[in-house]
């Protein structure tokens, strides 16, 4: 099926082994819906992943709201996955460094708070800021921190981004709900670069998604997860793209759209090589090879969940409406 451009396929997960297709009627009905009801194939959810630059104050957030509004106006089912806003992850890492070195981190913390609350008219982040302050105070006291503590601190970047986007969408009449992936994506306890437990995670993501009202837009936090004790873990640097690919796979999405500040994938870094050309289309194997060789727009683990479900990945520029 993967080798044929006009063929798609889906998996049936079951405890019934090879006879699953005879017993899992509901899953089979979903897979066959696109054949007997062609309009059902069109209605597949699109997963939209927004990077940090897209969620920055000013034009970035405005463009994201426009994109989401246009999708809803077209009655396209969507699910959103967000990274930390702008350079929030770097700021949080710096706060940890300052606190652990016994330096005064409060001015940097105040700057972080001001930057994150700029687009908001209500104090919806007060609890998050209080929790962050308490953790930093503890780090300053012992002048050290573990990878577990670092994951806790970094998680505020994605949590704040998701809460901010939910608030702004709601202000525009677009009902949205935060889905905190720490309650959904389960991992081992390898803090800083945790491995996902696919079966547990898929079950939790599907359950949360299917419980939403039809018109509600789910906003998933990228990058963060939790072990089975409920302790916060992260999926590695740039792991938000991996989160988006996992969620697209779990939801059997029609497409994963990665919105960023560049037009797509180029033959070389256009910032370093002015003659670099945009690549119109790549096979999964080519994209995976690029990821393994360090293409920054891709995460090396991102491609595999998409290959397994034959889900296209489209790289789009948030700031160019005609970008394809």
Label every PLM stretch briefly.
Residues 277, 319-324:
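Long, charged amphipathic helices and adjacent flexible linkers at domain junctions
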Residues 8-10, 177-179, 314-316:
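General small-molecule cofactor/ligand-binding pocket signal
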């Amino acid at each position: 099926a993967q080798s044929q451009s006009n063929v798609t396929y889906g998996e049936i997960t079951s405890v019934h082994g090879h006879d699953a297709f005879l017993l899992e009627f509901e899953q089979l009905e979903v897979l066959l819906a696109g054949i007997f009801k062609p309009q059902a194939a069109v209605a597949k959810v699109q997963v939209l992943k927004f990077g940090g630059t897209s969620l920055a104050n000013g034009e970035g957030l405005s463009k994201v709201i426009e994109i989401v509004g246009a999708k809803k106006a077209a009655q396209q089912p969507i699910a959103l996955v967000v990274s930390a806003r702008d350079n929030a992850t770097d700021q949080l890492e710096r706060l940890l460094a300052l606190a652990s070195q016994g330096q005064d981190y409060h001015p940097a913390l105040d700057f972080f708070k001001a930057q994150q609350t700029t687009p908001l008219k209500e104090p919806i982040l007060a609890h998050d800021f209080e929790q962050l302050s308490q953790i930093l105070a503890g780090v300053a006291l012992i002048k050290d921190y573990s990878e577990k503590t670092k994951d806790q601190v970094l998680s505020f970047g994605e949590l704040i981004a998701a809460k901010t986007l939910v608030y702004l969408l709601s202000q525009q009449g677009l009902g949205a709900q935060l889905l905190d992936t720490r309650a959904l994506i389960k991992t081992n306890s390898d803090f800083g670069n945790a491995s996902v437990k696919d079966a547990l995670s898929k079950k939790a993501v599907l359950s949360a998604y299917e419980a939403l009202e039809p018109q509600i837009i789910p906003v998933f936090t990228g990058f963060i997860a939790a072990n089975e004790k409920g302790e916060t873990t992260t999926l590695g640097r740039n792991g938000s793209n991996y989160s988006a690919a996992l969620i697209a796979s779990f939801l059997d999405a029609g497409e994963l759209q990665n919105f960023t500040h560049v037009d797509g994938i180029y033959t070389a870094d256009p910032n370093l090589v002015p003659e670099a050309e945009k690549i119109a289309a790549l096979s999964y194997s080519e994209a995976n090879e690029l990821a393994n060789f360090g293409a920054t727009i891709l995460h090396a683990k991102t491609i595999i969940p998409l290959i397994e479900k034959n889900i296209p990945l489209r790289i789009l520029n948030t700031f160019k409406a005609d970008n394809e």
